[in-house]
């Protein structure tokens, strides 16, 4: 079962209900809407289709609104484009003009105050470089020298590496888009070009004004200033997106992999989800198969510890959107098989602080690995418990049971967490019982599996203080167990020694009213023994201990309840008999 989550950008190639259904079936967990393009009508229709497709499949698919952000762009060019030549001077004006080979203008009037002689200005995603020769604040102009030939077309992006620009945290357009997202009930906001913690707080204030504090903020780190201020940004954020496109323009390309690793590591330590984004399977916009480098890129992001991997143009406008998701699913699934979960847990343990929830999270992850648990099941009010366990990357899947569908969708971004809808409970026992049942319904857990359950106080979030090891199964009978062993096998019901001798086979579970010395030969073949007669000093108890097999005595009507050939598991430590094979300690 794949733990890494897949984020897909929805666009013209993927906006239909039919295509969205295929993407979800192929592995999409979160749908991203890029508000750099499209209007409210388009995005509203896409949100409606996403909800309809997810309802049809019964899946909790999150919706992420990606803002355009406070970017700098050029204005229009003469004849739609100009040819810039190496060594020629080019004036950048703060007043809008139609661009020529002598002068162009930009959308950000404050640029003249932010750059200085020697600064570098990059145009069109870094394809054309300019060196600042002089700044004339009075004329509102920047004199530059063109560093390489290139064609500059209308409204291209402008980057200023190493310069702290005084753009606002969010633009008026961003604010309108976010309010629209609130009205539509999106789950995540991914603000672009976040440079400092105050940028995030501006957005949080806007969410609070509209009573939408539950929407999570996943800032996109796309420049050096954002990298430098990462600790403060993370403190006020719910996660992070490593947006390698603009980041690779703002900082040297050779630094991007190192920054990616560092940002992922910081998110992992805090238990906050991190998305690795941009050009992951870029060639699949045109080709049905990825390059080997792209496959390695996806795998290495998973080895770094990313929670989610993102597709952009591949699913928004590419020719092979479904194949791209399937490819990402296959690479992620195979990469996860190669992870050393014990080593990851050991490293994470040394990287984080210690709260009660952290202590429980660590213990749960350790216990699940040591007992080879089939799953970790956690009833959760806010999703916090599930996230705190997920940060230790246990090998077992985490089934988070919550009554809140919004929390289920937000957990769609967290590695290894699979959310299920639960019911309100009035007591801890009721809550745990419901969680076990929902984990069975999910298909992740089946009867006989050993699971680790963790939870807190009913109705209170952030109070995780309980851990329980539990065998999921139909307990069909209980008596008094002798010893701590367990065994699995077919039942042989015998009323006396002669019948036992005739029917017993190696590895069968002998079920009888009582035993005596005439049954010793049959007992030596048995994997376990169950008697109706009770008593810790009974013949069955003493012989069972001497033979080293699990024994349950005092099980009322055992010879009537159990039938010949019935496969059961005998758990002496609990005195329980399970239907079928059960994973017991």
Swiss-Prot record:
Reactions it catalyzes: pyruvate + ATP = phosphoenolpyruvate + ADP + H(+)
GO MF annotation list: ATP binding; kinase activity; magnesium ion binding; potassium ion binding; pyruvate kinase activity
Residues where ATP binds: 34-37, 73, 156
CDD domains cross-referenced by the UniProt entry: Pyruvate_Kinase
This protein's record includes keyword Cell membrane: no
Binding site for Mg(2+): 222, 246
Keyword Amino-acid biosynthesis: no
EC category name: transferase
SUPFAM superfamilies in the record: Phosphoenolpyruvate/pyruvate domain (SSF51621), Phosphohistidine domain (SSF52009), PK beta-barrel domain-like (SSF50800), PK C-terminal domain-like (SSF52935)
InterPro entries with a match to the protein in the record: PEP-util_enz_mobile_dom (IPR008279), Phosphohistidine_dom_sf (IPR036637), Pyr_Knase (IPR001697), Pyrv/PenolPyrv_kinase-like_dom (IPR015813), Pyrv_kinase-like_dom_sf (IPR040442), Pyrv_Knase-like_insert_dom_sf (IPR011037), Pyrv_Knase_AS (IPR018209), Pyrv_Knase_brl (IPR015793)
Binding of substrate, residues: 32, 245-246, 278
Family indicated by similarity: Belongs to the pyruvate kinase family. In the C-terminal section; belongs to the PEP-utilizing enzyme family.
Subunit relationships: Homotetramer.
Protein name from the UniProt record: Pyruvate kinase
The encoding gene: pyk
């Amino acid at each position: 079962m794949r733990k890494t989550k897949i984020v897909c950008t929805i666009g013209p190639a993927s906006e239909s209900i039919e295509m969205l259904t295929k993407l979800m079936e192929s592995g999409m967990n979160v749908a991203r809407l890029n508000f750099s393009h499209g209007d409210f009508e388009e995005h509203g229709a896409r949100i409606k289709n996403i909800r309809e497709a997810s309802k049809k499949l019964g899946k909790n698919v999150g919706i992420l609104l990606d803002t355009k952000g406070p970017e700098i762009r050029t204005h229009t060019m003469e004849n739609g484009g100009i040819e810039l030549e190496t060594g020629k001077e080019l004036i950048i004006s703060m007043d809008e003009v139609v661009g020529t080979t002598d002068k162009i203008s930009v959308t950000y009037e404050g640029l003249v105050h932010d750059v200085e002689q020697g600064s570098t200005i990059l145009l069109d995603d870094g394809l054309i470089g300019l060196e600042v020769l002089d700044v004339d604040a009075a004329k509102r102009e920047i004199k530059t020298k063109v560093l390489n030939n290139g064609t500059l077309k209308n409204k291209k992006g402008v980057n200023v590496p190493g310069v702290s620009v005084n753009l606002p945290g969010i633009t008026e357009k961003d604010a309108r888009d976010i309010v629209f997202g609130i009205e539509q009930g999106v789950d995540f906001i991914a603000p672009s070009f976040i440079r400092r913690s105050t940028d995030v707080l501006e957005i949080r204030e806007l969410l609070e004004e509209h009573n939408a504090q539950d929407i999570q903020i996943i800032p996109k780190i796309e420049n050096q200033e954002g990298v430098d201020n990462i600790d403060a940004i993370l403190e006020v954020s719910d996660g992070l997106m490593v947006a390698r496109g603009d980041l690779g323009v703002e900082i040297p390309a050779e630094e991007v992999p190192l920054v990616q690793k560092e940002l992922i590591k910081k998110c992992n330590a805090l238990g906050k989800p991190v998305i690795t984004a941009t050009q992951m399977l870029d060639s699949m916009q045109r080709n049905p198969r990825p390059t080997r480098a792209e496959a390695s890129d996806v795998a290495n992001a998973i080895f770094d510890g990313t929670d989610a991997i993102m597709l952009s143009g591949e699913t928004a406008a590419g020719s092979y959107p479904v194949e791209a998701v399937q490819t990402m699913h296959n690479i992620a699934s195979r990469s996860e098989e190669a992870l050393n979960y014990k080593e990851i847990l050991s490293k994470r343990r040394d990287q984080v602080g210690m709260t009660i929830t952290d202590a429980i999270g660590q213990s749960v992850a350790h216990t699940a690995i040591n007992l080879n648990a089939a799953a970790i099941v956690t009833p959760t009010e806010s999703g916090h418990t599930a996230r705190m366990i997920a940060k230790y990357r246990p090998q077992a899947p985490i089934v988070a049971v919550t009554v809140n569908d919004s929390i289920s969708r937000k957990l769609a971004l967290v590695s290894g967490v699979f959310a299920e809808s639960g019911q309100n409970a009035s007591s801890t026992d009721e809550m745990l019982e419901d969680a076990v049942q929902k984990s069975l319904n999910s298909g992740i857990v089946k009867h006989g599996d050993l699971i680790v359950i963790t939870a807190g106080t009913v109705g209170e979030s952030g109070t995780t203080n309980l851990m329980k090891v539990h065998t999921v199964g139909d307990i069909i009978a209980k008596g008094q167990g002798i010893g701590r062993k367990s065994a699995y096998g077919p039942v042989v019901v015998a009323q006396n020694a002669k019948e036992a001798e005739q029917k017993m086979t190696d590895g069968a579970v002998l079920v009888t009213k009582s035993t005596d010395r005439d049954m010793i030969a049959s007992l030596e073949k048995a994997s376990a023994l169950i008697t109706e007669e009770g008593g810790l000093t009974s013949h069955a108890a003493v012989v069972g201990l001497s033979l080293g097999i699990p024994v349950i005595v005092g099980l009322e009507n055992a010879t009537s309840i159990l039938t010949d050939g019935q496969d059961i598991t005998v758990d002496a430590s609990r005195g329980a008999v399970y239907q079928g094979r059960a994973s017991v300690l």
